[in-house]
Amino acid sequence: MAKYLSTKTYGHNIGLSAVFRQPNAVHSHCHLLHGYSLQFKFTFGCSELDNKNWAVDFGGLKPLKAWLEDSFDHKTCVDVNDPHKQDFYDLQDKDLCEVREFEGVGAEKFAEHAWRFADKLVREMTDNRCWCESVECAEHGANSAIYTPFITQKISMAE
């Protein structure tokens, strides 16, 4: 369990404007293309601080920002199992979009994909002293999803 937590946010204002659709949401308008300027909040944990009393040196996170930009900045995010995947590649061939394929799309899956990249990066940067506790991906002010691989305990409000 982490003794120290620190957070880094890449806000809606940096322009991670991604478009995607939920191919399995046939009951909802979410099966249609729609997009957001995504926001990502990373929570990092560690048991010991470095010699500067930091959990994570945020200056070393440039590869994380570059990955976010390459994955989401003016990108069309497509589920690998989307039955219309080729249509998006046809648009890309006409220079009408840039496709990025993911094993699942949407705020929950984007948070998971970002966590996987960030956790590997931070562990390498710190010789496993730090890790990524969670990632929150927000579509806008009202909708977000959080991914954490760590076990969480549900407590009753009566306790």
Where do the model's predicted regions map?
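Charge-rich, low-complexity N-terminal segments
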Residues: 1-159
